[in-house]
Amino acid sequence: MSTTGAKFDYDLAVIGGGSGGYAAARTAAADGLKTVVLEGGEEVGGLCILRGCMPSKALLYAAEVLHLASHADLWGIRADNVTFDFAQVMARKNALIKDFADYRRQQLAGGKFKFLRALARFADPHTLELSTGDKLTAANFVIATGSVVAPPPLPQLEDVGYLTSDTALSLARLPKSLIVLGGGPVAVELAQFFARFRVRVTLVQRSAHVLSKLDDDTTGELEKVFRREGIHLYTGTKPLDARRVEDGKEVALEHNGQTVRVRAEEILFALGRVPNIASLGLEDIGVQVEDRRIVTNDQMQTSLPHIYAVGDCTGLNEIVHIAIQQGEVAAHNAAHSDRMKQMDYRLLTEVVFTEPQVAVVGLTEKSARAASRPYLAASYPFSDHGKSLIMEAKDGFVKLLADPASGEIIGGCCVGPVGGELIHEIIAAMHKRMTVHELAAMPHYHPTLAEIWAYPAEELADKCGR
């Protein structure tokens, strides 16, 4: 129910029209709050639709089709001299993104809340100054301004020139060779995309492994495939400087105690993103910011309780479904201060859309050890599984983590074919707090990829208490 009265223009002002902001506005409007959404970007849709999840996955799927066609002889199918039209690949991606963005624009302008195209800055804790010259007031705020590409660690890159995760998704032509700086999800996805479109790729990662937050057995599987597909990996390597050379660009690296120089036509800087909050005036009104991110509690409140922050601007988890959940929690709490909800990250999930796909939910072995959480783990390889052998998808494995005393499933990992789909069985199991005994007893159709989960479940069921 609206509580503005004569004091404020709106019950809730949402700054940012991406996934988190739209979720907050939709939830608030459904709860009867007078709501306004402010979007100051040149385009409407948010990172996921415009320059993140959707365009990258459209391109990655095209790369997968090209890879399968190029290896059709594995199934006895002749497909000689497989070629591609990169302009058509990009045109298909652009058409999809236009449709997705148009739909989001329609949702934002659908009349359930006010939608304004303007940048916003806090003049005081309850007032926003807009780039249009107007001002508006609100009882509560949700900041959902997303993230921007992080500044490069090598100052020379500004002069040399480089691609970012934003610009790499909109190239008119492919470079012949590419140096990828970074080893996180975006870096490895784009590295494999370009490599499968026959670009010579060198990937440079500071940590000992790509996807360094995950378990070493997980990242090792992906690195094995990358090397097999011709991607040159430099792990445990520090970039030192960059310069232009006659035939392209060169990066100096510190690798195994020596200086190594690698050259390519282009450099892709993919060392992450940072919260997009610099222009909001948060420090002036006392909103706590640490390490360039907005600090929130589990109710998504900032240090000023009537101001909430969700999504990438909090710097916690750059994952769309988390931003959506946070937006819904923030809006609910703005509407119902007497029965507030809080975020539960127990089912935190991440999927990396390489091939094999990498998907994790809950605890990894690394995070369980860091938290001193007792666990038992069991895994099973796709190289010994009937359906994956039929598909020639032999790389990777599934792994379960369980509480030793109760057998409750506390984590799952899938490195393998359609891992992003397969992990949802474990998400559902953990949502209902199932044990490995219950998962092992659940029927699985044969032959399917999903039945592979039964094997580690059965192994753990024999070891865990009930």
Model-derived segments and their meaning:
Residues S2-Y10, R26-L33, E39-L174, T202, ...:
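Glycine-rich flavin
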Residues A13-I15, A120, L136-G146, V180-L181, ...:
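Short hydrophobic core segments
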Residues I15-G41, L47, M54, A58-V65, ...:
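Flexible, glycine-rich terminal cap/loop adjacent to redox cofactors
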Residues G16-S19, E42, L181-G184, D312:
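Glycine-rich Rossmann-fold phosphate-binding loop(s) that bind the pyrophosphate
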Residues A25, A29, A191-R196:
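Gly/Ala-rich phosphate-binding loop of Rossmann-like dinucleotide-binding domains
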Residues V149, G286, R292-H306, E365, ...:
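FAD-binding beta-loop-beta segment adjacent to the flavin cofactor pocket
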Residues E158-P175, R261-S337, A440:
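FAD-site-proximal beta/loop scaffold in flavoenzymes
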